[in-house]
Amino acid sequence: MPKKEVVDAVTMKRALTRISYEIIERNKGIQDIVLVGIKTRGIYIAQRLAERLKQLEDIDVPVGELDITLYRDDVKDMEEPELHSSDVPVSIEGKEVILVDDVLYTGRTIRAAMDAVMDLGRPRKISLAVLVDRGHRELPIRADYVGKNIPTSKTEEIIVEMEERDGADRIMISKGNE
């Protein structure tokens, strides 16, 4: 399938900077925020948001990692689910947890992530930040912070590449068979 770059590194950086500003504005500061990245690329995005928030507000925002493997509604269909550990370095009790992921599609990943977060404690609020919202929701979930809205068909795929994992920052769209 041919891939087409739709967002380059500079545009991706701008989108993350905009999300950082929105987080500050909507929360009247960031003292009670915990960023929780959904494995795998959500973690890199959460770390970048924390770095940008530190530059803007001079506050270290805790960043956690969330593995949702056992919370997925398709886990029974997997032969042997690959388990990773979740690591949230602070208590989330009474905090605002911002779940961070690369792409919002059906909403099922986010539903699983909310279940996983609730097993860690009782946050005051859960919000969602995504780099890309591609539409096609199957559950009533929406992102509070969106880097880019990229409408797709159901047969297309959004591919997010991150420097930390893939060697480059970019977002591509892969055309499926329509």
From Swiss-Prot:
It catalyses: UMP + diphosphate = 5-phospho-alpha-D-ribose 1-diphosphate + uracil. A motif (PRPP-binding) lies at residues 97-109. Its EC number is 2.4.2.9. It is an enzyme of class 2 (transferase). Keywords: Glycosyltransferase, RNA-binding, Transcription, Transcription regulation, Transcription termination, Transferase. One of its GO terms (molecular function) is uracil phosphoribosyltransferase activity. Optimum pH is 9.2 for UPRTase activity. Substrate binds at T40, R41, D101, D102, V103, L104, Y105, T106, G107, R108, T109, R134. GO terms for biological process: DNA-templated transcription termination. Belongs to the purine/pyrimidine phosphoribosyltransferase family. PyrR subfamily. Homodimer and homohexamer; in equilibrium. Regulates transcriptional attenuation of the pyrimidine nucleotide (pyr) operon in response to exogenous pyrimidines, by binding to the anti-antiterminator region of the 5' leader on pyr mRNA. This probably favors formation of a transcription terminator hairpin, leading to a reduced expression of downstream genes. Also displays a weak uracil phosphoribosyltransferase activity which is not physiologically significant. This is Bifunctional protein pyrR. The gene is pyrR.
